[in-house]
Amino acid sequence: MDRQKALEAAVSQIERAFGKGSIMKLGGKDQVVETEVVSTRILGLDVALGIGGVPRGRIIEVYGPESSGKTTLALHIIAEAQKKGGTCAFVDAEHALDPSYARKLGALDELLISEPDAGEQALEIADTLVRPGAVDVLVVDSVAALVPRGELEGEMGDNHMGLHARLMSQALRKLTGSVSKSKTIVIFINQIRMKIGVMFGNPETTTGGNALKFYASVRMEIRRVGAIKDRDEVVGNQTRVKVVKNKLAPPFKVVDFDIMYGEGISKMGELIDLGVKANVVKKSGAWFSYNSTRIGQGRENAKQFLRDNPAMAAEIEGAIRQNAGLISEALAAVPDLDGTPVAE
């Protein structure tokens, strides 16, 4: 009884000093169990993430080799958030964002774009936007391009050991609290580097030290695994995403989809692939059929048929969403990015 009174006195003192809500019970009325999400606009990836999209109030890392679709994925998330009336910002440290491509993917003219000179400036802008809860989604493209001011002002060839990692570590310590309170999704796009002298295991690593690996609630590895051809012309990429880390659902799910040049992620190709996995679309040889109706010979013809018949496409999507659990199991059995099966 004395311990209970002591606890109540301690809680009361904490609330007087730091404000109501500074300490709460796990099962208290103030706690919200449901995680709010924003869809990635990729049906398979929403299923692979386990919660239906990327979580609000969390830090997300998207990394992969060059031209693998990292910025395209981030722009799709921005487009979805804007469609629901949200405000989004894009901190373009690489100075490489193509506004016309962003519009094609569905980004609206209200998207805030910043092209900072130094890494400190970029992260200060991010912190200023996140702290008051002014934005719903903030993308930093990319961590590798966040050049510390000391490096910018120094001579070419100067050694700046650990400066970049120190900058990221400090920024994430500041950001993580305000990201959670403001329910902002902060997406860091990152590049891959090779570790020298690694004889066994994966020599690849991401830039900016280890801090982002710890602070990120979701880490997604994105890679180009093949080309999509129309006769001899390459018209898109076959892309694979692996959920490397997930604090909100089981990780290591893998999903494949198509990115078409000038168009973005192909929804129809995904409906066919996931439809086959969920046993909604039947495949017999090269033919695809739905409810005994043949929809095309070959994947590209089936995609075109669904484009011409949006009602059937919507019906297939509804059936896939109902079979999300079945698809989730199938995604866990997809081969890893290096060809080995993913451990469940």
From Swiss-Prot:
Positions with a binding annotation for ATP: 64-71
This protein's UniProt keywords: ATP-binding, Cytoplasm, DNA damage, DNA recombination, DNA repair, DNA-binding, Nucleotide-binding, SOS response
Subcellular location as annotated: Cytoplasm
SUPFAM superfamilies: P-loop containing nucleoside triphosphate hydrolases, RecA protein, C-terminal domain
Superkingdom in the source lineage: Bacteria
Gene Ontology biological process terms in this record: DNA recombination; DNA repair; SOS response
Example of a GO MF term: ATP hydrolysis activity
HAMAP family: RecA
PANTHER family: MITOCHONDRIAL DNA REPAIR PROTEIN RECA HOMOLOG-RELATED, RECA
Described purpose of this protein according to its UniProt entry: Can catalyze the hydrolysis of ATP in the presence of single-stranded DNA, the ATP-dependent uptake of single-stranded DNA by duplex DNA, and the ATP-dependent hybridization of homologous single-stranded DNAs. It interacts with LexA causing its activation and leading to its autocatalytic cleavage.
Protein name: Protein RecA
Taxonomic lineage from the root: Bacteria, Pseudomonadati, Pseudomonadota, Alphaproteobacteria, Rhodospirillales
